Amino acid sequence: VRRRERYDAIRDILTRRDWDALEKLPATGGQILRALMLFVQDNGALVRWRAVEALGVKAKALFPEDRAVREVIRSFIWTMCDESGNLCRMAPEAIGEILAMRPDLRPEFAHLLPQYMVEEPFESGAMWALCRLAEAGHAADPDSLRGLEACFGHKEPRRAGLSRRLARLAGLKPSRAGYPPVSFEDYDPSTGTLKMAT
């Protein structure tokens, strides 16, 4: 399958959210993962989120010894460096989803995510990734969450909401009550749609 045909096929798969078709695609795991990386920067929010989900689905389906997953994670980490010249704003979410589906890779990569909670423009994405990992049974080191409450009242609703969600998942209680309610757009993996979350 030519690269353009593969790209078009994956876009169709993401549109339909057809993970069986993703598995049957005539391409190597690395080729599919690299193509999905492109869709994480798509103009459409729903396509981006489904690409994130698909990265986890495909990573889980590959054999543990397949180096393609590690290479893609390292590529996402590189896209969070200014030197890359191609910042991928949803790189933390992609890494978090892959690690949620691949517990064997968490010791190698999960500890890298907390540092991005204070790194523009990845703060909210890093929080989402840590929430995803916590929901998958991998809690962040409490020391890495110090200062999280400073985001509870952040003017950006997503950052405020995700910081509160992460604190709840980590069992951290706010030092005071009275933070105003927030709502923000989030991806619902149970339905494959975007919805308002709190």
Describe the function of each predicted region:
Residues P121-F122, E156-S163, P174-S190:
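Boundary/linker segments of alpha-helical solenoid repeat arrays
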